[in-house]
Amino acid sequence: MMSKINQTDIDRLIELVGGRGNIATVSHCITRLRFVLNQPANARPKEIEQLPMVKGCFTNAGQFQVVIGTNVGDYYQALIASTGQAQVDKEQVKKAARHNMKWHEQLISHFAVIFFPLLPALISGGLILGFRNVIGDLPMSNGQTLAQMYPSLQTIYDFLWLIGEAIFFYLPVGICWSAVKKMGGTPILGIVLGVTLVSPQLMNAYLLGQQLPEVWDFGMFSIAKVGYQAQVIPALLAGLALGVIETRLKRIVPDYLYLVVVPVCSLILAVFLAHALIGPFGRMIGDGVAFAVRHLMTGSFAPIGAALFGFLYAPLVITGVHQTTLAIDLQMIQSMGGTPVWPLIALSNIAQGSAVIGIIISSRKHNEREISVPAAISAWLGVTEPAMYGINLKYRFPMLCAMIGSGLAGLLCGLNGVMANGIGVGGLPGILSIQPSYWQVFALAMAIAIIIPIVLTSFIYQRKYRLGTLDIV
């Protein structure tokens, strides 16, 4: 494979990204070279896209990314050999890329880093609860559930709650661990802090308002013994506070006193602040977010809110703001037992892939299918960046067609109050996360998200081709 690589193309790529001196670091993923450039403005993307091995390029998260294809590893090795760059891992690249980010991009990046390690558990929990609802909560034709009809399934239904409860009920433990780790603190202290937020000594958060909690009486003031089960924002703020406290203490406490002073003082202060100030404040924020989303997505404004979110979600992905929707989903699951947001995200994934299908059907451009076919499949499975950056944004109108299809599908979901058990896989498999009573409506919404973008994209492509106005950004 290395012999098939034209060294002239490699040298030209180096020149077009600004030369060897402009490359801070370079790594690669499955299909893309990921450059961190000292001066991003010196790169010439339009000329780079003319290179024979390049299928597209874009800037995201402070990285200049060049789409090569599945043989990107060979090009990476040739590039490393030509530039003399040392091979780096993804974390080193991300750290270097932050220098090219604006403050709000860095904030979103930090937010994503905290929640990303939790995704395997959260996705598993969403799918497990979905399967549990199918066997235990969905009435069959005789009015009974499968668990009622078959005792063995009732056992499975009860057993699966052990996993579902562990993931969502004790979610603050994972959030505190990840937040403290991100801040450079000791992860095990984050776990301990998280456990203190969901300890059996505390009144269950779901009973708040139904009964009076006990208190810790400190004389001049008291603190209610209330837990933060399944709460996102209190756990996030508490974890960040512990990380800040510990890292600051490390700087001023001598090494020989570290184990005696830093962990103990950090934990006591963080746990006290978590229950006295941070937790109640975070609960207020979380309740406010839940109130706003509930009225926008489930009240009389639901059709409008769902349609707008479905239409605008793809642009949120481009800006990176979509990372914040994870916390909203988790907050809704805690307060409502499900989320109306995740179904709209899954539909947006489908619509982006469908717009690419419209291009595949209409276009006969040389080598385009090498990126369009994998991009469409990827989007239908929940990862939309290859579809958006590789095809839809290049032509521009497929992006709008996908947004229209997603908005109309969202409108249908809003009209019918579609809810998901939790976050899960996106795209077509996203139906597995939907509460079973909404499967038929969601299947129809999926059909809208597939058909509308394909038809609109194909029609506009062919019309522009006939008029000679088809252009690529």
UniProtKB/Swiss-Prot annotation:
Catalytic activity: alpha,alpha-trehalose(out) + N(pros)-phospho-L-histidyl-[protein] = alpha,alpha-trehalose 6-phosphate(in) + L-histidyl-[protein]
Residue numbers carrying Phosphocysteine: 29
Molecular function via GO: kinase activity; protein-N(PI)-phosphohistidine-sugar phosphotransferase activity; protein-phosphocysteine-trehalose phosphotransferase system transporter activity; trehalose transmembrane transporter activity
UniProt domain PTS EIIB type-1: residue ranges: 1-89
Keyword rRNA processing in record: no
Biological processes annotated in GO: phosphoenolpyruvate-dependent sugar phosphotransferase system; trehalose transport
Record's keyword annotation contains Nucleus: no
Induction record: At low osmolarity, treB is induced by trehalose-6-phosphate, but it becomes uninducible at high osmolarity due to induction of trehalose-6-phosphate phosphatase OstB which is part of the biosynthetic pathway of trehalose synthesis at high osmolarity. Repressed by TreR.
UniProt-annotated catalytic positions: 29
Domain named PTS EIIC type-1: residues: 109-473
GO cellular component, one term: plasma membrane
Transmembrane segments: 111-131, 159-179, 188-208, 226-246, 259-279, 301-321, 341-361, 371-391, 399-419, 441-461
Cytoplasmic side: 1-110, 180-187, 247-258, 322-340, 392-398, 462-473
Stretches assigned to the Periplasmic side: 132-158, 209-225, 280-300, 362-370, 420-440
Entry EC no(s): 2.7.1.201
Gene3D superfamilies assigned to the protein according to its UniProt record, in alphabetical order: Glucose permease domain IIB
UniProt keyword list: Cell inner membrane, Cell membrane, Kinase, Membrane, Phosphoprotein, Phosphotransferase system, Sugar transport, Transferase, Transmembrane, Transmembrane helix, Transport
Function: The phosphoenolpyruvate-dependent sugar phosphotransferase system (sugar PTS), a major carbohydrate active transport system, catalyzes the phosphorylation of incoming sugar substrates concomitantly with their translocation across the cell membrane. This system is involved in trehalose transport at low osmolarity.
Further comment: E.coli does not possess a trehalose-specific phosphotransferase enzyme IIA component, however it seems that it use the glucose-specific phosphotransferase enzyme IIA component to delivers trehalose-6-phosphate into the cell.
Entry remark concerning the domains of this protein: The PTS EIIB type-1 domain is phosphorylated by phospho-EIIA-Glc (EIII-Glc) on a cysteinyl residue. Then, it transfers the phosphoryl group to the sugar substrate concomitantly with the sugar uptake processed by the PTS EIIC type-1 domain. The EIIC domain type-1 forms the PTS system translocation channel and contains the specific substrate-binding site.
PANTHER family: PHOSPHOTRANSFERASE SYSTEM TRANSPORT PROTEIN (PTHR30175), PTS SYSTEM ARBUTIN-, CELLOBIOSE-, AND SALICIN-SPECIFIC EIIBC COMPONENT-RELATED (PTHR30175:SF1)
NCBIfam families (UniProt xref): EIIB_glc, PRK11007.1, pts-Glc, PTS-IIBC-Tre
Protein name: PTS system trehalose-specific EIIBC component
Organism: Escherichia coli (strain K12)
